[in-house]
Amino acid sequence: MKTPHILIIRFSAMGDIAMTVPIVYSFAKQYPDVRISVLSRPFAQPFFQHLAPNVDFMAADLKEEYKGFRGLNALYRRLVAKQFTAVADFHNVLRTRFLRLRFLLDGKAVAHINKHKQGKKLLCREENKVFIQQPTSFQNYADVLEALGYPIKPEFTSIFPAEGGDLQLLPNIIGVKQPSERWIGIAPFAAHAGKMYPQEKMELVVRKLTEKHPSWRIFLFGGGKQEIEILNQWAAQYPQCICVANVLKGLEKELILMSHLDTMVSMDSANMHLASLTGTRVVSVWGATHPYCGFMGWQQKEEDAVQINTLSCRPCSVFGNKPCHRGDFACMNNILPEEIIQRIEEGLL
């Protein structure tokens, strides 16, 4: 009998790809005789390269080598050579539908994600919201596998061993955590204004943390020229801070550092999910979006989510990319820096 070989497809975005990891890991552990190949963008390789013996990673650059219709046909020919027995589409967009259809016409079993868009639409509409927790992305991914005949029980702690990633692979400036220290990560940025705590207020969080806890070290996470400039200003002003982008190159090394943090402070953004993959507690800050949309980090606690629950307009967006109905972004602006600091301290003192 032919060994089952399952293709799992998820191309973007980073946070969504990260959320596949607990499900892929659980699948691999509970079905050790099944071969699993994850098809994604090249940057995602560190998520999967050491995940389980029966998991391998396939990179596909959709902007270069596999661009456009001709590129997708070339990608399909590459995939067919692997002799997959079934395809799990964790993305369900135009590109993946094309690939899925080709496999279906070739007689392969296929299944795709249900994103529950209607429920999210009712949750985020301006009036008469239906305020119900939507299925999480983790559950949605697991449902795809179940449709292919592989029900799983999600079980995952970290991509690293219990002691965390190997700090010796990082530059000396990171060092070794001393008994008196707490290591705090702060990732203050997000793709959209509705998901980002105001910069001046987040700097207050940094300043007050350094004043209250002089033995704590703060690692600032961000990418892109403008973000790094802001983080460098903070690092210059507050000696306990390090701009991670200046000293660590590559996602794998950032994940190693995250695995040794006591707490990560993040928006509803990719860094929440990256830290979750390392088993690190995340204090998440929510504005226009809401955990009920189903994107809370893996095994993160609702009590660690900082949000204003008295605003009837929340959530107004699934992704935080819509203009504020009120015009004042009260969902973020009305969160006090002290609330975030208190939430950080509650888990550490």
Regions found by a protein language model. Give the residues of each.
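Catalytic machinery of carbohydrate-active enzymes
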Residues: 1-349
